[in-house]
């Protein structure tokens, strides 16, 4: 490609509305341009990277035995009503009607469509297992699009769906997809972790996220310092304290605390260790629970894990915290005065709370707390569960090492769906025994556009992007100095350009009438890994200046050796 026939569209200044590095660099490097909130056009440089991501994904999916298909982005509403997600999915699902007043959705995902397709096309267990994938634009009506294409409303996704007649068959495909995803992100040169995850609104029995480590990530991921254990913080188990509960050392007493409405105020005013305090949170109960609210209790220095709380059998989903009005109606006191003593609601406490002694908690009366509370002396031990978020330094759930927490960008997610969709949509095949058998499903997604974001977040410096070799829009940039004035420079540049193209290398020849400083800055910004500077002086010794974008290394290389050198460098990096 020649810059004279290309739209480079680089920017010198950082756009004011770009918050994270990837958004800033994608705009400055001429990769994307905003059309409306959460909607972006992909310019040539960005699209070249996007296509390279797609190609790697496609190759590995094909290698794993998946079959590529293409399904409509517009989907009939009745399929979503049949699966039950018409209501469950909420306002992120863009709904509309056509001129015939028929209801449709703009697809955020395709479980319903693929299930409908397979129930009409596959009739026997002999045709299974099958795994289908597509790479397609999706739409989710995000309430607050942000960070460029990291969280946009329209995005490109690879979604795959597998169909089976047994859990063992599903597990085999799930494992194959796990390995394929690991190969995909390894080929892309990304530092990532595969972590246990919650199944969320997709549903199912097992799930792993593939998280690229980045400080700007939206997720907290947890992993062991001494083993392969890794999980999303929502799912990470907080191991029960090893130490037994200490014997009571104080009598329980009622204390006036009119100015202590928070844990921080209580600790400051009474010089209490925060580890000797508890937080009591009220959430709405299931309709059949017998009480309108359920009380959940964690230690004062810990935080409730909403995902764990929502999985309690007596807690309503989605998790909803009680309003102050509901709290006062149920307990007779405000949120800052809640505690376990004489609480007229069912109570579930975290494992760490179960081993506490001589602790302080609200007295369920305005401006009062009990100090010196002890389980089984002052009140019976209630239901105990894992309720809290883990913290750095906790013991790893597998018993090996301690936990570290880092931020991550989710780029892939695989699920064992089981029969959630096939049961709802009556997707069956004739089993080996001749009877109808409900299909067992898996689904496997990769955010193609998010991969581009994650790669930039992990690979940049103060001059621009440092693309991994496999994702770079161009592998080589040829920068001829004054080629429009020097026939020799132009001839060498053109010859090199033709040779590199013939060897299958993506090369950009900068044939603009621009100052060298502008040419260098643009190539640094868009992140071309290998740069060749051709000048009259160096051609006197038949040499070219080579610069490696990532390492900054510069060296002179003989003109006769440069093509083989680049082919070797690129092959090694890939």
Swiss-Prot record:
A GO cellular component annotation in the UniProt record: cytosol
Q: Which domain of life is it from?
A: Bacteria
Gene Ontology annotations of biological process type: prolyl-tRNA aminoacylation
- Substrates-to-products reaction catalysed: tRNA(Pro) + L-proline + ATP = L-prolyl-tRNA(Pro) + AMP + diphosphate
Q: Which UniProt keywords apply?
A: Aminoacyl-tRNA synthetase, ATP-binding, Cytoplasm, Ligase, Nucleotide-binding, Protein biosynthesis
Subcellular locations according to the entry: Cytoplasm
**Gene3D superfamilies to which the protein is assigned, alphabetical:** Anticodon-binding domain (3.40.50.800), Bira Bifunctional Protein, Domain 2 (3.30.930.10), YbaK/aminoacyl-tRNA synthetase-associated domain (3.90.960.10)
The protein's matches in SUPFAM superfamilies, at most eight in alphabetical order, are given as:
Class II aaRS ABD-related (SSF52954), Class II aaRS and biotin synthetases (SSF55681), YbaK/ProRS associated domain (SSF55826)
Classification via Pfam families: HGTP_anticodon, tRNA-synt_2b, tRNA_edit
Q: What is its EC number?
A: 6.1.1.15
Q: Which InterPro entries match?
A: aa-tRNA-synt_IIb, aa-tRNA-synth_II, aa-tRNA-synth_II/BPL/LPL, Anticodon-bd, Anticodon-bd_dom_sf, Pro-tRNA-ligase_IIa, Pro-tRNA-synth_IIa_bac-type, Pro-tRNA-Synthase_IIa_type1
GO molecular function terms here? aminoacyl-tRNA deacylase activity; ATP binding; proline-tRNA ligase activity
Which top EC class applies here?
A: ligase
Q: What does this protein do?
A: Catalyzes the attachment of proline to tRNA(Pro) in a two-step reaction: proline is first activated by ATP to form Pro-AMP and then transferred to the acceptor end of tRNA(Pro). As ProRS can inadvertently accommodate and process non-cognate amino acids such as alanine and cysteine, to avoid such errors it has two additional distinct editing activities against alanine. One activity is designated as 'pretransfer' editing and involves the tRNA(Pro)-independent hydrolysis of activated Ala-AMP.
Entry remark concerning the domains of this protein: Consists of three domains: the N-terminal catalytic domain, the editing domain and the C-terminal anticodon-binding domain.
User: Which family does the similarity line name?
Assistant: Belongs to the class-II aminoacyl-tRNA synthetase family. ProS type 1 subfamily.
Q: What subunit structure does UniProt give?
A: Homodimer.
Instruction: Cite the HAMAP family for this sequence.
Output: Pro_tRNA_synth_type1
Protein's name according to its UniProt entry: Proline--tRNA ligase
Organism, as annotated:
Sodalis glossinidius (strain morsitans)
The gene behind this protein is: proS
């Amino acid at each position: 490609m020649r810059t004279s026939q290309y739209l480079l569209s680089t920017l010198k200044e950082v756009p004011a509305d770009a918050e994270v590095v990837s958004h800033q660099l994608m705009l400055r490097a001429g990769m994307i341009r905003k059309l409306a909130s959460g909607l972006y056009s992909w310019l040539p440089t960005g699209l070249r990277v996007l296509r390279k991501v797609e190609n790697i994904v496609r190759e590995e999916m094909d290698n794993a035995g998946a079959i590529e298909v293409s399904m409509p982005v517009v989907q009939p509403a009745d399929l979503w009503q049949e699966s039950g997600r018409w209501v469950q999915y909420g306002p992120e699902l863009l709904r509309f009607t056509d001129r015939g007043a028929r209801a449709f959705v703009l697809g955020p995902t395709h479980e319903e469509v693929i299930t409908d397709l397979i129930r009409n096309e596959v009739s026997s267990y002999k045709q299974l297992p099958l795994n289908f994938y597509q790479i397609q634009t999706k739409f989710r009506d995000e309430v607050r699009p942000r960070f460029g294409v990291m969280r946009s409303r329209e995005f490109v996704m690879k979604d795959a769906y597998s169909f089976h007649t047994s859990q063992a068959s599903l597990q085999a495909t799930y494992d194959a997809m796990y390995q394929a995803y690991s190969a995909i992100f390894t080929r892309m040169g990304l530092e990532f972790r595969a972590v246990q995850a919650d199944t969320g609104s997709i549903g199912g029995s097992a799930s792993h996220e593939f998280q690229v480590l980045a400080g700007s990530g939206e997720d907290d991921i947890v992993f062991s310092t001494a083993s392969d254990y890794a999980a999303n913080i929502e799912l990470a188990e907080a191991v029960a304290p090893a130490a037994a509960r200490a014997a009571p050392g104080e009598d329980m007493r009622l204390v006036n605390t009119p100015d202590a409405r928070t844990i921080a105020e209580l600790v400051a005013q009474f010089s209490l260790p925060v580890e000797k305090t508890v937080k009591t949170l009220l959430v709405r109960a299931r309709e059949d629970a017998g009480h309108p609210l359920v009380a959940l209790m964690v230690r004062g220095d810990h935080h409730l894990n909403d995902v764990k709380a929502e999985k309690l059998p007596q807690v309503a989903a989605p998790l909803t915290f009680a309003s102050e009005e509901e709290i006062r109606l149920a307990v007779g006191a405000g949120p800052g005065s809640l505690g376990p003593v004489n609480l007229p609601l069912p109570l579930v406490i975290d494992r760490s709370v179960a081993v506490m002694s001589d602790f302080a908690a609200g007295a369920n009366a305005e401006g009062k707390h009990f100090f010196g509370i002890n389980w089984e002396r002052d009140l019976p031990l209630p239901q105990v569960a894992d309720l809290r978020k883990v913290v750095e330094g906790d013991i790893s759930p597998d018993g090996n090492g301690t936990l570290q927490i880092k931020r991550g960008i989710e780029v892939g997610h695989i699920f064992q769906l089981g029969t959630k969709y096939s049961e709802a949509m009556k997707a069956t095949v004739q089993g080996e025994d001749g009877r109808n058998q409900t299909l067992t499903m898996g689904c496997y997604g990769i955010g193609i556009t998010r991969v581009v974001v994650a790669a930039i977040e992990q690979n940049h410096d103060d001059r621009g992007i440092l693309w991994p070799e496999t994702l770079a829009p161009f592998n080589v940039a040829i920068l001829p100095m004054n080629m429009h004035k020097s026939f020799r420079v132009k001839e060498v540049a053109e010859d090199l350009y033709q040779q590199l193209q013939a060897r299958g290398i993506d090369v950009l020849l900068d044939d603009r009438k621009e100052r060298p400083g502008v040419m260098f800055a643009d190539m640094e910004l868009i992140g071309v890994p290998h740069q060749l500077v051709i000048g009259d002086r160096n051609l006197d010794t038949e040499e070219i200046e080579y610069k490696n974008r990532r390492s900054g290394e510069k060296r002179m290389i003989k003109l006769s050796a440069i093509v083989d050198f680049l082919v070797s460098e690129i092959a090694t990096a890939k």
